[in-house]
From Swiss-Prot:
One of its GO terms (cellular component) is plasma membrane. Pfam families: YidD. Its main location: membrane. It is a peripheral membrane protein. Could be involved in insertion of integral membrane proteins into the membrane. Belongs to the UPF0161 family. This is Putative membrane protein insertion efficiency factor. InterPro entries: Membr_insert_effic_factor_YidD (IPR002696). Keywords: Cell membrane, Membrane.
Length: 82
């Protein structure tokens, strides 16, 4: 399941994203965050974390550095100095 989800995100990164204007407000990008979350927390939790990140990424927020946390959460990583 992990490999399938990561392959789908990689397809987005190489086949779709290059044709869209840059819009992610965070580092790492939402797609990279999703891959890292899946690798670190597994398919279900990683997918939930990635979807949560995508929902947080919009023009009305500051964005910034938001790495995948060591523990499962769908909220922004509060342990990082922003």
């Amino acid at each position: 399941m992990r490999k399938i989800l990561i392959a789908l995100v990689r397809f987005y990164q190489t086949g779709i994203s290059p044709f869209l204007p840059p819009s992610c407000r965070y580092y790492p990008t939402c797609s990279s965050y999703m891959i890292q979350a899946i690798q670190k927390h597994g398919a279900i939790k990683g997918l939930a974390m990635g979807i949560g990140r995508i929902l947080r990424c919009h023009p009305f927020i500051k964005g910034g550095y938001d790495p995948v946390p060591d523990h499962f959460t769908v909220f922004r990583n509060k342990s990082v100095d922003h």
